[in-house]
Amino acid sequence: MATKVEEINKLKKKNLHFRQCSADSLSNSSMQFDLSGLNTPVGELATSNLPSPAHPPFGELHQESRTSNSSAMHIENVVASRLMYNEVANGSFALEPKNILVVTKPRKHSLVYKTAEITKYILTIGTPETKVYVDMRLARSKRFSAHNIAKEANTDIDRIKYWNPYICLIKPSIFDLAITIGDNSTLLYTSWLFQKIGPPVLSFSDDDVPGFLTHFSLSNYQQHLYQVLTQNVSLRFCSRLQCSFHKYDEKTKQYSLASTTYSLDEILISRGEHPFISNLNVYNNSELMTVVQADGLVVATPTGSTNISANAGGSLVHPALNAILVTPVCPHTLSFRPIILPDYNVLNVEIPLDSRSSAFFSVDRHESVEMHRGDYLSIVTSHYPFTTIQNPGYQWTKVLEDKFNWNVRERQKPFSRKPSLSDVKDTSDDKFDITDNSYCREFSADIDG
């Protein structure tokens, strides 16, 4: 029987379809790979015979031993996947995309015009087989105008296609590259479109300032697109969380899987509209870790550590690290502090049967789903990371400095008694006329008195 290492090596050769380039084509990078046709083979990953971890019902989960086969298998799969993707990330790749998806931020007319410019540029410099898929709601848009784009690019209008979420769900492997035009929420929406496998993503920031997820400036889109379409690029695989929602049936005392969602940023469990604090049982690898009494709980990836988790007091974690962040939101006691766990751990968050009220959970800030007494979430690291194209000039710490205004705030200065230009002729005493901001709304009618 083939060993686990042999299965992983076979899977890499079969599904990822890496073909090392000849020695003559090697440039500055020590390794180069050809990623043409990457997504079609990767689509077989979902049906491959690689064993996947089994998650038993919650009622049995906390009774399992720490050395259970399912936990060991999950750890083995996560570590093997991590090694596989780390090996890929060390090379440079020639994408050679044929079908390019463009995701545009809504409610902003200027980005529709920019989508038209990018579409025309891709059709101009791309091969005759290159097709661009834009949001189907732009089909009748006068700002986009597919006929004008095809005419100005001197090409066939059939090269401009339209996508909707259903196409991304049933045929994710037809896309070789995805381009996002907007902000972090646009990239999170793209992650939602491709819940499992998906194309590499080139993310443009709409405010021309790189963000935590949007690494490229929109003002220089021609330079970045030319490099991606004609040269080798580096990829980064951002870990995602798999969140499985299990519902409890009071009559049968059984659990049923209601939904499974993949998170790039975080999973937020909150009390929602209820006046009571949330009461949550948190299990780590089948053992009760703590009982959370707080306004909520955030389970985040390193990519999402700068979002809600940071607002709740969680640590900032570099997205290249492999970890799961668990952060309470306004805990009732200080006994539970933010914690960082290995990415191969299995977390289960349960609503106790004696809880005063239900709770709500949301994945990447999408619509909230109510959890009733007995329901639980099973959260593990997904085997389907989110692939982004790296910007060589992007530095995560630099973005922290810009977004969080590090080293920008002026230090408090001492009171100065030196006369300013407007005070040169002032012969009054040294007292301040206005000592502080007044918050009193009641003033005397006679201000001269």
Curated annotation (Swiss-Prot):
Matches recorded under Gene3D superfamilies: Probable inorganic polyphosphate/atp-NAD kinase, domain 1 (3.40.50.10330), Probable inorganic polyphosphate/atp-NAD kinase, domain 2 (2.60.200.30)
Keyword entries, A-Z: Cytoplasm, Kinase, NAD, NADP, Nucleus, Phosphoprotein, Transferase
Entry's family note: Belongs to the NAD kinase family.
First-tier enzyme category under EC: transferase
Protein name, as recorded: Uncharacterized kinase C24B10.02c
A GO cellular component entry from the record: cytosol
Source organism of the structure: Schizosaccharomyces pombe (strain 972 / ATCC 24843)
Matches recorded under HAMAP family: NAD_kinase
Keyword Lyase: no
Chief subcellular location: cytoplasm
InterPro entries reported in the protein's UniProt record: ATP-NAD_kinase_N, ATP-NAD_kinase_PpnK-typ_C, NAD/diacylglycerol_kinase_sf, NADK
Subcellular location: Cytoplasm; Nucleus
